[in-house]
Curated annotation (Swiss-Prot):
Species classification: Eukaryota, Amoebozoa, Evosea, Eumycetozoa, Dictyostelia
EH domain segment(s): 11-100, 115-204, 223-310
UniProt feature coiled coil, ranges: 512-718
Region (Disordered): 309-511, 733-755, 790-810, 822-852, 905-932, 976-1082, 1101-1133, 1157-1196
UniProt-recorded name of the protein: Epidermal growth factor receptor substrate 15 homolog
Length: 1196
């Protein structure tokens, strides 16, 4: 339990009830939701915030001990005390706080009798001057010991001081003390005194009457005696001068202002001197001021009267009781009024003097006697009776001649025997110095019964330690006069009778008188003896009292000296105390500041601790992440090592490829030289062509005559259509996952007879084509280029291919007949499995060549079946539609609709497909002299090393040659390869399907000079013509047999598709013949002098395929690694054929490098046709002369 939470039992019960009220949610603690309870105290939010922070030691809630501390702090704030925990420790009991709408702690406010008697005893103890009051200064000291705050004690004083006279009587003191005790018990002070408290505090003395109140400015007689004695010792001439009074008064330690006021009050008649009673007034005022009592502004009348020696205090306090004659005879000692001063310095008790008289019963002369009682007082003093009333003077009888004797003994009568003995008893003298008189009783003869009764006033005077003499005149004068005795008259009558008797002469009764005197003398002696003994006793007691007085004075001097020393020590201690208080105050301020700093630092520490915990958690997370990263780093390093090894392997491959590149460049340079030589030869051939044109015109006439003769001879035979070699089929199609079947149709041109009478120089008949637009810029008609082919046979030892000219286009076709299913595989650079179609632009003419590069070649006997199936290609996008063979009309014109016109097989552009990419086939008539001697050009192409296959280009994925020679079906720039399901060495036939890998195969055959019907010099002799006629007849029979198999052959071999993933095909529209419903599509890739992927000029677009859709295998948008399949045809273990390196992109344009080697005048290599079906592909290359500026509808 917290030390600050300790409360009295009454408060504990009340605070527990308050805790139950404040705990709204009944969870046993005061949380933030319950903190609104403290707003009932009406304190500010700042004070309540400080109270909460001091009470809250559990960080967010208060338990019951913390709640008690908070209530104490609220009460301190309401009282105006500092709101600190130290304030709780300094105040023993803090009253409950005042809360709105909450009842306070209940109290009945009734004082029990036992408790009230304790308060009365305290009042009597602290009422030092015995005036029945406790002044404010005394109350401050008394009540300050309770430890309650000054503000609370001030409230208690205001409640208790009912009379508002700035002092408390006994009843008010009882109420004030009870209120203090109630606060210490834990009760709250009331705003006004309850009636029950006033009723229960009423004080009744033990005598049954309320306690008397001594007048405020009454000087007690003991004090007056002391002041008078002090005056007698220091007075000069019965007065006190101002200088003497100043020296004496300054010893009191009062201020000059108070001493001046005391002088003015004492010197009431402004005489500037002090007599005895003024001196007593001044000393009494000094005594009261030192006790803390305020000085009056004017001299009270009671103070002036009580300073005189003749003042009777009994007349102020209570009148003396008067006894009746009967009661006075029975009562020997009346009640005495005692006055207590309460001052420890004085031990004086003043008793009222009470006189008792007893009359003498006999009429005879009886002397009056005074009885003396001497009860011992508490102080050891003596009780002195009042003075005995003086008896009348008696004269001794005249018969006695002795002179009158006077008894001066103290306490006895004086008998005067002089005067002739007339007076028997002399009148005792009155002495002021006599303070005690002992009465005696004259013993009469036994015959006379005498009654002795006391006849004196009893007064008891106690001599204290402060008196200077045992006997004092003032004591006698200040005593009230004795009450007259009832026996005074008889005594006087007896005395008068005696006196009268003494005046008479001596009678016989003188004897009796003498005897009477003797008896009186005896009585005197007895009385004297008794008085002597008693006087001795009194003297012993007096000596004792004087000795005691001297000792007390000596002790008083010592005490006074010690008192002065103590005062000096007190002053020094007060100075030290004030300095200590100042130090304590500064320390308290420092402590409060330190506590504020501690609170702020504590909050900062908590924030830093929370931040440290967060940073620690973050550090752990980062450390764990770092460990994971280290693990990943190790793995990556291992992968890096592997990649480095692979890179080293690849670098070795690159070095070998670079070496191959060097070889290729050397070959290209060689080819370039050959091309330049070919250009010169072509120029010579062009000149020769012009010469032959003249001869051709003459021969045409002879040819027409021969044709007429042949027609007559062949009436019984069916005409055989011989396909002219000048028909160039640029049929190219790409099927995506479909198979298109097109049948190539052999279009007969003319039947050349082997008659020796055939005039070579006669012009054969020309069949004109139907009217078609001759320009692609005509608006009315669709442009369909039409040309007529004239067949001219020449003999050439190196090449037996037929060279045809049509519209200035020089074309040669190398037909190949497939006789075996699969030819022998070899690593030769030139294969002979396919037809070669090449085109060159020479003097405005276009020379095309269909080359198929393949290292697997076969040598076979050439058959001039110009309608061979190898040269029929499926149209692009045929969608697996099969078209029957179509025979051209008499005009022999074939049109191709690229714009969706016509029927037949549908190409992807909506037009019908036909095998002839140039439209209608030409007739056998020759329009111009374009068929000059071009055998040398054909021979050049056959011998051109550019088209020879090098092992380095067979299957290598060289970045500089993969576009021409790599085996792929996807984009080589990271595209995914497909499996090669067929052997690259397969030759296109009815039984085998070419490989789907994009392989450029050079399909060529060895020439057979014996099968060439025409000499190379274009001049025929009779022997050669006869052999030619025989061969033509055999060829016609073979052609008839082959015409029956075109459909089957086309179905097996012409389903070619291509999916090289370049998505960069350019289409070239060709004319369409609506009558024949045929369509021919030609498109190709132009390798211009631009970087791959640059689609700014429309040459390439790697982002979309031919259908306009995004390529699924775009190497720049997919991270799919290439899946390779090893080449099973790599029989020779060519390291560049079967290897799968990852060089999927060309670092520079092929054309650029090619042109750098060849030169700007060399023709650019362009892929004219790419056809791939499933696993088959084929390609045709077109060489365009850049120097030819003649516009063509097929120019890209």
């Amino acid at each position: 339990m917290r030390s600050e939470a300790q409360v009295p039992p009454a408060q504990k019960v009340y605070y527990e009830e308050l805790f139950q009220i404040a705990d709204v949610d009944k969870d046993g603690v005061i949380g933030l939701n319950d903190a609104s309870f403290f707003r009932n105290s009406m304190l500010s939010n700042d004070i309540l915030r400080d109270i909460w922070q001091l009470s809250d030691v559990n960080n967010g809630y208060l338990n019951i001990d913390d709640f008690f501390v908070a209530l104490k702090l609220v009460s301190l704030a309401q009282m105006g005390a500092p709101v600190t925990l130290d304030s709780i420790k300094l105040i023993p009991v803090i009253p409950p706080p005042k809360l709105n709408d909450i009842p306070p702690l209940k109290n009945d406010w009734i004082i029990s009798n036992g408790e009230k008697q304790n308060y009365i005893d305290l009042f009597n103890k602290y009422d030092e001057d015995g005036d029945g009051f406790i002044l404010g200064s005394q109350a401050k000291t008394i009540f300050g010991t309770s430890g309650l705050p000054t503000k609370m004690l001030s409230h208690i004083w205001n409640l208790s001081d009912v009379s508002k006279d700035q002092k408390l009587d006994c009843q008010e003191f009882i109420m004030a003390t009870f209120l203090i005790r109630s606060v210490l018990k834990g009760y709250e002070l009331p705003n006004k005194l309850p009636e029950s408290l006033i009723t229960s505090s009423h004080y009744i003395s033990s005598a049954g009457v309320p306690s008397p109140k001594i007048p405020e400015w009454l000087i007690p007689p003991p004090e007056r005696i002391i002041y008078e004695d002090l005056f007698n010792k220091n007075q000069q001439g019965g007065i006190f001068t101002g200088s003497q009074a100043k020296v004496l008064f300054e010893k009191s330690g009062l201020s000059n202002q108070d001493l001046k006021l005391i002088w003015d009050l004492a010197d009431h008649n402004q005489e500037q001197v002090l007599d005895k009673h003024k001196f007593v007034i001044a000393m009494f005022l000094i005594s009261q001021r030192k006790k803390g009592k305020e000085l009056p502004q004017s001299l009270p009348q009671l103070l002036l009267e009580s300073s005189k020696s003749t003042f009777n205090p009994s007349s102020i306090t209570s009148p003396p009781p008067q006894s009746s004659p009967q009661s006075s005879q029975l009562q020997q000692q009346p009640p005495q009024q005692q006055q207590q001063t309460g001052d420890s310095k004085y031990n004086i008790n003043l008793n009222d003097l009470v006189s008792n008289t007893t009359p003498i019963g006999q009429p005879n002369i009886q002397p009056t006697t005074t009885t003396t009682t001497t009860p011992a007082t508490a102080s050891g003093g003596l009780n002195v009776s009042g003075l005995l009333s003086p008896p009348p003077q008696q004269q001794s009888p005249s018969i006695v001649g002795t002179p009158p004797s006077t008894i001066t003994r103290e306490g006895s009568f004086t008998f005067d025997n002089s005067g002739g003995g007339n007076n028997l008893l002399a009148k005792p003298p009155r002495s002021n110095s006599i303070t005690r008189m002992n009465s005696f009783q004259h013993q009469l003869p036994q015959q006379q019964q005498q009654q002795v009764s006391p006849q004196s006033t009893i007064s008891n005077t106690s001599i204290g330690s402060g008196s200077s003499s045992f006997l004092s005149t003032n004591a006698t004068t200040s005593s009230p006069p004795p009450i007259p005795s009832t026996s005074s008259q008889p005594t006087s009558s007896n005395n008068s009778s005696i006196t009268s008797n003494n005046n008479n002469p001596i009678s016989p009764t003188s004897t009796n008188i003498t005897q009477l005197f003797e008896n009186i003398e005896k009585v005197k002696q007895q009385v004297f003896e008794q008085e002597r003994i008693r006087q001795e006793e009194i003297q012993v007691k007096l000596n004792q009292e004087l000795q005691l007085e001297a000792e007390l004075k000596q002790q008083l001097a010592q005490e006074q000296q010690q008192l002065d020393e103590v005062r000096e020590n007190v002053k020094e201690e007060e100075i030290k105390l004030s300095s200590i208080k100042a130090d304590n105050q500064s320390l308290k301020e420092q402590i409060s500041t330190a506590r504020v700093d501690i609170k702020s630092l504590k909050s900062q520490l908590e924030q830093q601790s929370s931040l440290l915990r967060e940073k620690s958690e973050l550090f752990d997370e980062q450390n764990e992440a770092l460990s994971h990263l280290n693990d990943d780093l190790k793995e990556k390093q291992q992968e890096l090592q592997k990649n480095k090894q692979q890179i080293e392997q690849l670098l070795s491959s690159i070095e070998s490829i670079k070496q191959n590149r060097t070889d290729v460049k050397n070959q290209i340079s060689t080819v370039t030289k050959q091309l330049n030589d070919s250009k010169l030869e072509l120029k010579q051939l062009a000149e020769e062509q012009k010469q032959q044109k003249q001869k051709l015109a003459e021969e045409q006439k002879q040819l027409q005559q021969l044709q007429q003769q042949q027609q007559q001879q062949a009436t019984s035979k069916s005409l055989t259509s011989v396909k002219s070699d000048d028909n160039i089929t640029f049929l190219s199609g790409i099927n995506t996952n479909t198979t298109s079947t097109n049948t190539a149709t052999s279009i007969p041109t003319a039947s050349v007879s082997g008659n020796d009478n055939w005039d070579f120089f006669n012009s054969p008949p020309v069949k004109s084509s139907s009217s078609l637009p001759t320009s692609p810029f005509d608006d009315d008609k669709t442009f369909v280029p039409t040309f007529t082919t004239t067949t001219t046979t020449t003999n050439n030892n190196n090449n037996n291919n037929t060279i045809n000219t049509s519209n200035g286009n020089l074309t040669f076709t190398s037909p190949v007949k497939s006789t075996v299913n699969q030819l022998k595989s070899s690593n030769s650079s030139v294969g002979g499995t396919g037809g070669s179609v090449s085109t060159r632009k020479l003097s405005g003419a276009s020379v095309s060549s269909n080359n198929s590069f393949n290292d697997n070649t076969s040598i076979d006997t050439l058959n001039n079946h110009f309608g061979s199936d190898q040269f029929s290609f499926n149209s692009f996008g045929s969608n697996n539609l099969t078209a029957p063979p179509t025979t051209s009309s008499s005009t022999n014109k074939v049109q191709s609709d690229f714009f969706g016109v016509g029927g037949g097989n549908k190409d992807p552009f909506g037009g019908d497909s036909n095998n002839n990419p140039f439209g209608e086939e030409s007739t056998s008539s020759i329009r111009d002299g374009g068929s000059e001697t071009l055998s040398e050009a054909h021979t050049l192409f056959d011998k051109d090393p550019l088209f020879e296959t090098n092992d380095a280009f067979q299957s290598s994925k060289d970045p500089f040659g993969q576009i021409l020679f790599s085996n792929f079906t996807k984009d080589s720039f990271g595209g995914e390869s497909v499996s090669n399901n067929s052997n690259n060495s397969s030759i296109i036939s009815s039984n085998t399907i070419p490989s789907s890998n994009f392989t450029f195969n050079t399909n060529s055959t060895t020439t057979n000079n014996r099968q060439s019907p025409i000499d190379s010099d274009l001049f025929s002799d009779n022997q050669q013509q006869q052999q030619q006629q025989q061969q033509q007849q055999q060829q016609q029979q073979q052609q008839q047999q082959q015409q029956q198999q075109p459909t089957q052959s086309n179905q097996n071999n012409q389903s070619f598709t291509s999916n090289d993933s370049f998505d960069d095909f350019q289409t070239t529209p060709t004319p369409t013949n609506n009558n024949n419903n045929t369509t021919t599509t030609e498109f190709g890739v132009k390798f211009s002098d631009t970087t791959f992927g640059d689609s700014s000029n429309g040459d390439f677009d790697f982002g979309s395929n031919v259908f306009g859709q995004p390529s699924a295998n775009d190497p720049f948008s997919s991270s799919i690694e290439p899946q390779h399949q090893p080449d099973t045809n790599n029989v020779s273990s060519d390291p560049f054929k079967g290897g799968f390196d990852d060089f999927g992109s060309a670092p520079f344009s092929f054309d650029n490098k090619f042109n750098e080697v060849v030169g700007d005048d060399s023709p650019s290599l362009t892929t004219a046709t790419t056809t791939t079906t499933n696993d088959n592909d084929n390609g045709t290359f077109v060489f365009n002369d850049n120097n030819n500026n003649t516009p063509s509808p097929f120019d890209s």
